[in-house]
Structures are given as structure tokens and as C-alpha cells.
């Protein structure tokens, strides 16, 4: 099984390198450059447009979009919504990072509006963010996961099962970053043990 996953992953990576897809990113000002560089490193070509007057045209022309909810001020709300809706219209893949979900009432209202009006291909966040998306059962420590939510060898099976059930309910892939990463659809959950404690000391590793 592991060999098959590695082979499939290598083929996907090679395909990205060959096609060099243009990926539209709505990021936050803390990690915009890092996210653009990570897209380049993976073989894609980033565009970071976030003006509401152009995001629909940009998103429709790209191979897919990533919406990062790190900045909910002013025009970002409209830009995220327009980007999400046009991706749904043209049936492009759409990744959503609900940064800080559960941290503040305003941010939660922005989140609810997006989830109500946009379907996401992938929702990825730390465990506290994902649990808030799923059932409002967790409160993030700012944009970091709450200590009591973090995955361990004792709790990872329950987290994986939660991710599968949430994936089925929302009809989306769920990716949870943490000490042990979880990537799940309704049928399977994969655990990735490639993390390091130092990653939590560098801002934006989840965004990337």
C-alpha cells in the first residue's frame, strides 16, 4: 500500500511539473511570498490577485484556486466569495484554509458565509480549525491549534475517523496538519508522519 501511494504521488508530482498549472492564491500578507514560492517549487505558477474587480476573471483562467482566510478585512471577504463562486461555476479545484476558525465572532461569520455559498474541493487546516468547521466544538488558540486538540498516537485514530465523517458530510477532502498529518475522504484516511516540532516555530507552514 505504501509503495502504491508513493508511486502515485510521484506520478502526480511529475504531472504538475510537466503541465505547470497557473494557481490563483488569495493569501494573507504574512505568508503570501512563501505560498507563491511553494507553488513554484511544486512546479506550478502562482498568481496572487486579491482585488474583487479582477478575481473572477483571474480565477476562471487559472487551473484552480487556494483561498486562505488569514485576512478577513475589507475587500478580502468579497474577493474570497467571488473566487469561490466562479471556481464552482467553471468546475475548477478549490482549496480552502479556514485560518483562525473559531477565534473570533467576525471571522466565524465570514467562514459561515463562505461555507454556505461555496463548495470546496479540499478543506485544510489545523485540528482546531477543522473541528470548528465541522461542529463548532473547538476554539482555536489564535491561529494555532488548541493544545487539547493536538494529535498524538493515542488520539490519531479518532481524528482520522472524524476527518472521514466530515469529508462525507461536506463532500470534500479533509486535510489536517499537525504533529501527525491526516488526509481523508469519506472512505480512507492517510496518516503522514513527516513533521518536526520546529515547524510550529515557523509561521505559515500550514499555509504552505
Regions found by a protein language model. Give the residues of each.
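Small-residue (G/A/S/T)-rich helix-start motifs and N-terminal tracts that mark the onset
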Residues: 1-81, 86-88, 93, 160-208
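Intrinsic-disorder/low-complexity, polar/charged segments
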Residues: 51, 73, 104, 152-155
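Short C-terminal domain-edge/linker segments immediately following a structured domain
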Residues: 55, 96-100, 124-128, 204-207
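Short beta-strands and strand-loop turn motifs
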Residues: 65-68, 93-98, 142-146
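Glycine/small-residue-rich loop that forms an oxyanion/phosphate-binding "nest" at active or ligand-binding sites
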Residues: 76-125
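Acidic, glycine-rich active-site loops and adjacent beta-strand->loop/helix elements
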Residues: 99-103, 129, 180-181, 196
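Conserved phosphate/ATP/ADP-binding segment of small-molecule kinases
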Residues: 107-189
